[in-house]
Structures are given as structure tokens and as C-alpha cells.
Amino acid sequence: MKRTVLLLLIAIAHLPALATTHVADTLTIALVGDIMMGTTFPSVMLPPNKGRDLFRDAKDILRRADLALGNLEGTLCDGGRSTKGNGPNSYSFRTPTSYVHLLRDAGFDYLSMANNHANDFGPEGIASTEHCLDSMGIKYSGIAGRVESVVIRRHGLRIGICAFGHNSYTLKHTDLTLVGRIVDKLVKETDLVIVSFHGGAEGRTRNHLPQGSETFLGENRGSLRQLAHFCIDHGADVVYGHGPHVARAIEVYKGRFIAYSLGNFCTPYNVSLTGISGYAPLVEIQTDRKGRFLGGQIHSMAQERGQGPRLDKAHRAAQEIKALSEADVPRSEARITPTGALRATLSFQGENE
């Protein structure tokens, strides 16, 4: 009898610990804007040392996060014909496929493809980019008719991620019926939902968040305030944007985090880096397991031509975002210090856990 009990206890001790899977109380998420590491079109403009130093100052922050997300502005491919012509101002971005390992080494887990450069080299360029990201285990979404959304598991939590753009080949954020359908599906199937969008007018004079829709180059670039609130009203927990090539306001709405634009992050060539366009914020936030914003940090970085983001001890990106947030979203449920600390102004005590 004793031997039977002993054998039973040994067997129980070796059972898989499925029932005791730890669910994290908090989640750390790192968010950045546009990434275009270099291009071979129309001429070769690539960083020194094969790009190994591009993310030097950002790696530790990106790697320590539970999730690191950004926007891949362009393609990863080694050939093909530009869909925008061959002129010097075509602005088609073709990064060598070998550079994909730099993204994995930097710590990225997810990259949006829903932007106006994903189709620079047509369907072949999109397929090559997807193949490269797949080879590194980096998730992606945002192209219509391809990957609509992804789910990443971290610490017992299922995190759903989707991305929207303003071009015809992307999942369009101006189609709120589409946005609502995708977000609703993720809310039902996952524990926490992150939405990425590429939108808004571009340039140094477009850093303020307007009311209503934005038009740029004759194209509807979306009503981004409405879009972000719509996503959160439908159950999303984190919404982050890019597209204007400058940083914009940060808001906490109904306890959920919104970054309206994180500007340029790693764009050493063919993108203006003058003045505020050179600010490269890396935003690190913490949420609870329900997706509610707890706090965070804007890590101020800056770019110069030919190099990636470098830490900026003057905290210029944080101070720019602080000023924009106070002007454009004064009712935000978060405050930003001059050195970039993000602090929630509301407590969730008493809410159902």
C-alpha cells in the first residue's frame, strides 16, 4: 500500500504544470515609430558596419520589454521594380533582406506593414518582406487579403495585435466597420488588444493633433482622434500611431494608452531628420493584465543622417510630446514629466478584477 501511494505521489509530481501557468500582473510594452534601415533604390544608401550599430542605444530597452512593436516603413527585398517609378524623388524603400536579422537582434516582436511604403516593390516586395520576418519569428499584419491580425502569448496572456493604414492595399482605418470587426474579434479571443495605425498628414508643421479628418496629397489620412477612441470603445487596450514623421500627443483615455504618432525611429536615409523630425521617441509602458495603463517612460532619442536612434540627455522628444499632449489632449488621464516619466492620474481601485 505504501509503495502504491509513493508511486502515485511521484507520478503526480511529474505531471505537466498546466494548471499552474503564471499569469502576469503587469505587462511591459515598448513602442516605436517608423523603421527604414537603409535602401538600395534608386541608389545605395546603407549605414556603416552593415547596420550593426543602428539600434545600439535602444537594444536594452527593446529586449527587456515583454513586447516590442514598431512600423516597418518599406520592404525587405533584393530586387524588383518600383511601383513609384525610377526618378530620384520616387521615395521607394528597398532594404536588403540580410538586414532582417538586425530587427530580431534589436528585440522586435511585431512590426506593422500597414503603411504607404509596404507596396513600393509590389506583391513580390510584400512577399519577400513577409518571408524575411517569418524567418526571424517576427509577427506582422496590416496588408489587405493577407495577415489580418496576430496573437502573441506572454506570461499566460494572449495579446492580439492588428494594424491599419490609409492605402488601398492596407486594412484601411477610414473603414470603421472593418476596424470594429477586427478589434471586436480580437477582444473576444484574447486577453489584451493592441492596435497600430499609420495615418495623418506629414511634416514638421503637422505635429499637432487636429479635430476631424486630415487630408494630405489629396488623400484622406483619417480622423485619428476618432479612430483611437473608437478602438478603445470597442475594447482595445493600447493604440499607437505613426505616419506624420513627427511625434504627436500621448493620451490616456478610459484608462487606456494612446500614442497619436511616434514619428521616425530608425530612418537614417531619405527621410528628413531636421529639427523635430529627428526626434526618435521610444515609449515604454506598463499595463495591468486587463490592459489598463499603469505608467511608463518616454526614452528620448534623436537621429542624424546615417545613424540610428541615439539617447538624448536633453530629453527633447519627451518635452515635445509633453507640450503637445498638454495642448491637444488636456483631459488625458496621464501626466508627463520633463524627463519623460508617464504617470496615470486615475486609480482603478474598486474596479472588478
Please name every model-derived segment:
Residues A13-A19:
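C-terminal segment of classical bacterial N-terminal signal peptides
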Residues A19-E353:
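Acidic, metal/ion-coordinating pockets
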